[in-house]
Amino acid sequence: MDKLIITGGARLDGEIRISGAKNAALPILAATLLADGPVTVGNLPHLHDITTMIELFGRMGIEPVIDEKLSVEIDPRTIKTLVAPYELVKTMRASILVLGPMVARFGEAEVALPGGCAIGSRPVDLHIRGLEAMGAKIEVEGGYIKAKAPEGGLRGAHFFFDTVSVTGTENIMMAAALAKGRSVLQNAAREPEVVDLANFINAMGGNIQGAGTDTITIDGVERLDSANYRVMPDRIETGTYLVAAAVTGGRVKVKDTDPTILEAVLEKLKEAGADINTGEDWIELDMHGKRPKAVNLRTAPYPAFPTDMQAQFISLNAIAEGTGAVIETIFENRFMHVYEMHRMGAQIQVEGNTAIVTGVKALKGAPVMATDLRASASLVLSALVAEGDTLIDRIYHIDRGYECIEEKLQMLGAKIRRVPG
């Protein structure tokens, strides 16, 4: 297994380009299964989960055509099997996203129960109940979800999400795109990635309104056609590099991004003392060599502060002036990185769903281990400001969400290298 070795102390300075958003790319790739012709999706990030999804299509008999810029063409008409096998699904929770499109387009699907990050319980029952509301018959047996559409296909339905679920909203929205009649999804997720998926389906000829609000209305159409679509930028990658510059007292300009989908994070960075300027597709942050001030924050569904940026701000608070409380309301077990940060000298107390972080002047390099995707990013940020060397093990977690993290950080002046395990 690869490891990262980071020598702390370098002040980051420079410009980088932001990759496409994994959390938009995965549902958009799943939605290509709805089309009645070839679909091209561009600006895909070079990540393990993306290649797993493309490999899953290959297993189903579809032959994706990939160019060197990681734009992919998929023609779902060549599908031969409607099974998403466990050996692929177990490494990637997002594979549940093929369930809705396959039942809607082909009338049946068999998808293994998913794997992925070990955060909280993340139930799939909302996906199942939503499809059942549209008339699907579903059995869960032998670790597989087996779904069949009723004769004549799925029917539009009114469905209320009793908890806000991003993938649940996406799965039911995709299924509803080809269902007969109108579907109304209430208490739907409002994330920008949901909006991106709706825009993609509409680009294929779908009729979805209200994405980005908590009520989405979908009028099913008879068929969806070919389209060419570019995935939105990754707001979490954007935020992570902004925090990296902030913790080191440095300056960064992130390009090919969208400041409007990161407002809660930018507000907290300003509160921490950062100077921030934005343009249509760029954000510039400058700390002018200052140590950040600790901030209080509470994670909540979009447009509030994103849970996927929580760990990065614990790193910021760990070396900030003062004390900050971080309250996690989305997932349980999301403070796993705290115990690794203790090894570096961070002063963090966890009480239930709250981490109280008292900033110290300096962290110390230490061997640490990544536990999940965003937690591992926080260890990288802490290592950038720690005295001496930090060795981060199990970085396959990082590679699931960050494209070429060491190369991008090197471009900003970080002393970081990957060593084979």
Curated annotation (Swiss-Prot):
The modification 2-(S-cysteinyl)pyruvic acid O-phosphothioketal is found at C117. Its EC number is 2.5.1.7. UDP-N-acetyl-alpha-D-glucosamine binds at R93, R122, P123, V124, D125, L126, D308, I330. InterPro entries: Enolpyruvate_Tfrase_dom, Enolpyruvate_Tfrase_sf, MurA_subfamily, RNA3'P_cycl/enolpyr_Trfase_a/b, UDP_GlcNAc_COvinyl_MurA. It catalyses: phosphoenolpyruvate + UDP-N-acetyl-alpha-D-glucosamine = UDP-N-acetyl-3-O-(1-carboxyvinyl)-alpha-D-glucosamine + phosphate. Its main location: cytoplasm. One of its GO terms (biological process) is peptidoglycan biosynthetic process. Keywords: Cell cycle, Cell division, Cell shape, Cell wall biogenesis/degradation, Cytoplasm, Peptidoglycan synthesis, Pyruvate, Transferase. GO terms for molecular function: UDP-N-acetylglucosamine 1-carboxyvinyltransferase activity. The active site is at C117. The keyword Transcription regulation does not apply. It is found in: Cytoplasm. The keyword Cell division applies. Pfam families: EPSP_synthase. Phosphoenolpyruvate binds at K22, N23. NCBIfam families: murA, PRK09369.1. This is UDP-N-acetylglucosamine 1-carboxyvinyltransferase. The gene is murA.
